[in-house]
Amino acid sequence: NGIALSPDGKWMYLSTANRQIRRYAVNSDGTLGAFTMFTEGVGIGDGQKTDVAGNVYSTSGAGPGIVRITSPEGKLLGTINLPIYGGEPKRQICATNEAFGGTDGKTLFIAGCDSVYTIQLKIAGIVPAHNVNK
């Protein structure tokens, strides 16, 4: 299950084992308000991240291998479908987590069952800050 914050830190998104994303208000003292149902359905349930516009990227977990992109208002904007493996034996497609990176933050790295996929986006994601001791 995944946790992501909105770019302004006012919302926390939590994916649940029953394929829901709940949205909580983050209070000024750091506590959480009551949740509202943000979105639910197939393609939700594992890792999630946000971009600079506040869109939420959620991975499907154990299949089908997709990343759903949902607006801050809860509207499905689109999906990223991972490749389907043909031949025998058939392998399950999954998308378990994702991270934004690259020099401009517009590369989305997606962890699959046995591969890592990358896709270039038009919008930057929230890239985690790194604390490097020199």
Each language-model region and where it sits:
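Blade-edge beta-strand/turn elements of extracellular beta-propeller
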Residues: A25-G41, S71-K90
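Beta-rich, blade/repeat-based domains predominating
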Residues: N1-W11, E40-V56, G86-T107
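Conserved beta-strand positions in repeat-built beta-propeller and related beta-rich domains
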Residues: P7, M12-R19, V56-A62, T70, ...
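Repetitive beta-architecture junctions, highlighting loop-to-beta-strand starts
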Residues: R19-I21, G33, P64-G65, I93, ...
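Blade-level signature of beta-propeller repeat domains, shared across WD40, Kelch, NHL, RCC1
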Residues: C94-K134
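Glycine- and Gly-Pro-enriched alpha-helical subdomains that act as flexible
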Residues: A4-A34
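Short Gly/Pro-enriched loop/turn and capping motifs at secondary-structure junctions
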Residues: G43-I44, N55, A62-G65, E73-K75, ...
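Conserved blade-register residue in beta-propeller folds
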Residues: R23-A25, R68-I69, T118
